[in-house]
Amino acid sequence: MNRIAVLNVVGLSDRHIGPHTPRLFALRQRWHHASIDPAIPAVTCTAQSDYLTGRRPSEHGIVANGWYDRSLSEVQFWKQSNHLVQAPKIWDELKARDPRFTCAKMFWWYNMYSGADWSVTPRPMYPADGRKFFDVYTWPYDLRPALKKALGDFPFATFWGPAAGVKSPQGAPDAATRWIAGSAKWIEKKHSPTLNLVYLPHLDYNLQRLGPQHPAVADDLRRIDAIVGDLLDFFAARGVQPILLSEYGITPVSRPVHLNRIFRERGWVTIKEELGLELPDIGNSKAFAVADHQVAHIVVNDPSIEDKVREVVLETPGVAEVYGPADKRILGLDHSRSGNLIAVAQEDSWFTYYHWLDDAKAPDFARCVDIHRKPGYDPVELFLDPAIPSAKLKILGRLLQKKLGFRMLMDVIPLDASLVKGSHGARPSSPLDWPIILSEQRLPADTLRSTEVYGVLKSAVLG
């Protein structure tokens, strides 16, 4: 078997390879290249599951980054157990062929209990007193102290939130990505896995925060180019063949679409008041949209209104398509976790999870970075609220409260969805905005389906 390192450069598309990315540009000239017709939806968990199983969501079950669990009547996002992926993974097949095969998963998702030999993934600790401590989960457990001794603590605050992709007291703009790259090199030196899956998220932040056309993105491109170049040199020196790919491309957006507010105004969303704030009671709602970037899985608990829901969503500005049962079968999205209907935004639009009509009644978690409690993806977590005078001083005050043992809310996130300037999830109209794959080995076509990446990776290992 050949030894392979898969460098997952999140958000990279052909549109970004140029003067600001000399290493990637040279690679694009020398290596074989293909565009990837993006996963549906083109989001992290679905794309990775397509790549690592060779199956579509109808088989592997990862219909988005999160979904409505009908048995619990709860929306659950960003879960970590690999048992959620309901199809064999590439390491299962390759290990069955040769027991000597080993795999490291460095920050790819569904990274707990996966069967990979070494895993590292972000995982805070939550003591019973309500506090939160940034940390990572590793398998084996002894990997965690060894990595932290070699690299220091993982700069979690720079992995997601207002400090991600910007210079801050928490670290350099690319601190999280550099730490992950360092962990991939450490794993290679210590264990030499056959397949090393490396997640490099740096571009993801400002492409969403500022938009892919913003001039400041040039600095992000230079930073990721340097990180990738260093990894290419490192792996080449050790006889490891790199493959570079991305999960999706990010396109400019200017219109947030608030489906749950529309549903609420029609009486379809049931609201529960708690301590003067409003929470959605999804199990008692007639319809609710589970928003994930440019895709929304629409749960319809009252079958008698499904046609009306579809009509209302299709008439909503910013909505491109609404898929029903027949469409889901064709697209490989016919799975029990999918919504009864699936809405796809126009390329310049994206879906919020917002259900409140008055910001004063928004739930407390809305103004926090809280990826698990929110019933949908929230890119506004990348911003500090511009309405808060001296927001950074407020953060310092909150951190002091935490250090003194007081409970506190890090409520510094705005509720203005118009701040977001880039998104993904829909299929971009231009292939220049599609994900890509670069390899020293010949690729089977100039354009690959997302499920065909599996075969490329398997062939690279098997030779």
What kind of feature is each model-predicted range?
Residues 2-14, 27, 51, 94, ...:
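Beta-strand elements within well-structured catalytic alpha/beta cores of enzymes
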Residues 5-9, 29-35, 43-49, 66-79, ...:
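Glycine-/proline-rich flexible loop or hinge segments
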Residues 11-14, 41-42, 57-58, 108-113, ...:
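Short, solvent-exposed loop/turn segments at secondary-structure junctions
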Residues 15-59, 102-104:
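Short, structured active-site-proximal loop/turn typified by the sulfatase FGly-forming signature C/S-X-P-X-R
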Residues 19, 42-43, 65-88, 92, ...:
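Secreted, luminal/periplasmic, and some membrane-associated catalytic domains
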Residues 55-211, 223, 285-290, 294-301, ...:
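His/Asp/Glu-rich, glycine-adjacent segments
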Residues 213-221:
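Glycine-rich tight-turn/loop motif centered on a GG-T
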Residues 419-437:
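Short glycine/proline-rich, acidic loop/turn segments that cap or connect secondary-structure elements
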